[in-house]
A protein has these predicted regions:
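Structured domain cores in non-transmembrane regions
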Residues: 11-92
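Short edge beta-strand/loop segments characteristic of extracellular beta-sandwich folds
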Residues: 4-8
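Glycine-rich, aromatic-bearing surface loops/beta-hairpins
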Residues: 109-161
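Intrinsically disordered, low-complexity segments enriched in Gly and acidic/Ser/Thr residues
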Residues: 77-124
Length: 161
């Protein structure tokens, strides 16, 4: 239910964080502008540390994720990522497979989009494993290609907001 990412700035000049949400349209990832949000640091991230959290808001396969962030430079913040299309998926036979970034985000690559989580849905009761690489190489992901709905969440540590 809870996925956490620890990050550290290691003298980063990042001044903010942008979270992105992408929806698979059958051929490419489309950015959901309504689900994109950013946070501005009170100072540059510097050598600061923090945690990004994805927490499922319920037990249903298509439950919303609440994205939270905790950092001395950014404070605490949480936002629920809602999707009417995902919420309307039929519950009978619905399965979800999740892939997550598996390592701490150290030595931040500023202004680089980092995929943190990919989630794919099927309605035939089967599960196809998915990897985080499905965001950058969806054409090589059977799970994304055969999904009825897929979403990806990313983060960008930014020089300017």
């Amino acid at each position: 239910r809870l996925i956490e990412y620890n990050f550290s700035g290691h003298r980063s000049e990042a001044e903010g964080v942008l979270f992105g949400c992408y929806i698979w349209d059958g051929s490419t990832w489309q950015k959901d502008e309504d689900a994109t949000f950013g946070l501005r640091c009170s100072a540059t991230l510097g050598s600061g540390k923090g945690t990004i959290k994805f927490e499922r808001d319920g037990d249903a396969a298509n439950a919303n994720y609440k994205i939270g962030m905790d950092s001395p430079q950014l404070g605490g913040y949480a936002q629920v990522m809602d999707s009417p299309e995902r919420n309307s998926l039929p519950m009978e036979g619905l399965t979800a497979t999740v892939a997550a970034w598996e390592e701490p985000v150290n030595d931040l690559a500023v202004d680089t989009e980092i995929p943190l989580l990919v989630r794919v849905f099927r309605t035939d009761g089967t599960i196809i494993p998915v990897s985080i690489d499905a965001f950058l190489e969806p054409e090589n992901s059977k799970a994304v290609q055969k999904s009825v709905y897929a979403e990806a969440y990313t983060v960008i540590f930014c020089y300017e907001m």
